[in-house]
Amino acid sequence: MTAAHLGAIGEADRLASLSLMVTVLDQKKAGVAAAIDEDEANIAIALSARKGYLDGRELAEVFAWLRPTDLVWRYVVNNYVQGRSPAPFEVLYWNADSTRMPAALHRGLVRMGVHNALTQPGGVSMLGTPVDLGTVTTDTYVVAGVADHISPWQACYRSARLLGSKEQRFVLSSSGHIAALVNPPGNPKASYRVGTTDERDPNRWSAAADKHSDSWWPDFSAWLAERGDGQKTAPKALGGYGFSPLEPAPGTYVHER
């Protein structure tokens, strides 16, 4: 949306590149939006409006029920029926540390998803500017996960094709929603497919795309370097442009229950 807005006001040159990570812009048959209707959306919006936010645990439950066999019933059997402790898994532990979502943001995202508004030029607006994804011409790097249950990779592929970028690089990682991104080099099980988005059908794209072993991170790093403005010295202190740090790390929010 920001890229489309900058293009509409004549400031697209402020973007050297655009990166979309497990991002669904076309909500048709994808994620939560495909599982609810208008009435259910209004109920969800009303519930978050009462408190002023959507609790992070409630949001995590929504995503868990998109994949109930692995993320719900598996733990019911293991923890409750068999009385075992779940095996430690750092990625899922990090995933459980969810955050709250302001009610206004929740309302906007739900309505945008139910109506699939981003696929319609002018379907949503930003700072008074109608959003048209087709006007986004910035070079784009898109990453999706082949086993992603939240952002299905086919939907990510369709979303990339909504943009007007002349140069797009689509990467399909051999992992799910989180592990597709938390994918450091050196994993012998990791692999990815890569190619342009000229092919209309995502499954045909997958069959023809180049396959590589290991992580996609080095590929992304090289792609960014080609479009960047060289390396810059890291700041010696946090903050800047009139914004000072709020408090020392890790902050107070991480201690809230």
What function would you assign to each model-found segment?
Residues 4-108, 225-257:
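Alpha/beta-hydrolase-fold enzymes
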Residues 95-131, 138:
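Mobile cap/lid helix-loop segments that gate and shape the active-site cleft of serine hydrolases
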Residues 110, 159, 220:
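Hydrophobic, well-ordered secondary-structure elements that form the walls
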Residues 136, 142-144, 148:
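Short beta-strand/loop motif that positions the catalytic acidic residue
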Residues 147-151, 177-179:
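Acidic catalytic loop of the alpha/beta-hydrolase fold
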Residues 152-162, 174:
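Short alpha-helix in the alpha/beta-hydrolase fold that links the catalytic acid
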Residues 169-257:
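Catalytic active-site module of serine/aspartate enzymes centered on a nucleophile-bearing elbow/loop
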